[in-house]
Amino acid sequence: MLIIETLPLLRQHIRRLRQEGKRVALVPTMGNLHDGHMKLVDEAKARADVVFVSIFVNPMQFDRPDDLVRYPRTLQEDCEKLNKRKVDYVFAPAVEEIYPQGLEGQTYVDVPGLSTMLEGASRPGHFRGVSTIVSKLFNLIQPDIACFGEKDFQQLALIRKMVADMSYDIEIVGVPIIRAKDGLALSSRNSYLTAEQRKIAPGLHNVMNSIAEKLIAGNRELQEIIAIAEQELNEKGFRADDIQIRDADTLLELTETSKRAVILAAAWLGQARLIDNQSVTLAQ
């Protein structure tokens, strides 16, 4: 496994791989890798000849400076995990390598609509930062496929739209959420939880299951369903942030013709803002 930190060296290897006709997969990450990331790596390895994993804590997508400062940086441990998985390349650039002129005045990629709705409404600029760094990684690594987790449901939808709108010839692969045995979705931010909070954390998934059961049963009183769910979360020790029930294919409001719904949930538990989602097939 080769660790690349500079753009000239990256470009040198990309040129060689292209000349050799290799099929390249990219797994973009911000590090602090867990089993969910490893599932992305496994999917990439199954679909390509060469796998790149990028590790870059992207300052452009953080809406709160304190969150950027305390985001876990575990490059050595991450590389050890990836080496055991037989990843070919790790691209781990410094911020100055990606944004040599700084963030102010940086050209960016913005995806209208999807970047400012739902999660984007509560985190201004977040998705603009995501789409910009993913676009830069696509330009630099020129992958044939890229793997993203379905835990970040809106992010995956945004990247699919960006790829379509910008005419990237890249297959986007969504990989299902990986959960702990108690149902908690794996996330780098789970490391913010205390031992006591970790015991409470699966409650978010349990509340989503309750919402899903109501939708499957034909209940469409969405405001009431959401209000009850928020109350349940608060009673469990969470601070409910946002719960939405949307059309899984458009992320717009549910209509009578919607075939699938997605439950999008975000809640604070101590210093950790946990997000999760669950798709539901609706009775027609």
Curated annotation (Swiss-Prot):
It comes from the Bacteria. Keywords: ATP-binding, Cytoplasm, Ligase, Nucleotide-binding, Pantothenate biosynthesis. Its main location: cytoplasm. ATP binds at residues 30-37, 149-152, 178, 186-189. (R)-pantoate binds at residues 61, 155. InterPro entries: Pantoate_ligase, Pantoate_ligase_C, Rossmann-like_a/b/a_fold. GO terms for biological process: pantothenate biosynthetic process. Pathway: Cofactor biosynthesis; (R)-pantothenate biosynthesis; (R)-pantothenate from (R)-pantoate and beta-alanine: step 1/1. Its EC number is 6.3.2.1. It is found in: Cytoplasm. GO terms for molecular function: ATP binding; pantoate-beta-alanine ligase activity. Beta-alanine binds at residue 61. The keyword Secreted does not apply. It catalyses: (R)-pantoate + beta-alanine + ATP = (R)-pantothenate + AMP + diphosphate + H(+). The active site is at residue 37. Catalyzes the condensation of pantoate with beta-alanine in an ATP-dependent reaction via a pantoyl-adenylate intermediate. Belongs to the pantothenate synthetase family. Homodimer. This is Pantothenate synthetase. It comes from Salmonella paratyphi B (strain ATCC BAA-1250 / SPB7). The lineage of its organism: Bacteria, Pseudomonadati, Pseudomonadota, Gammaproteobacteria, Enterobacterales.
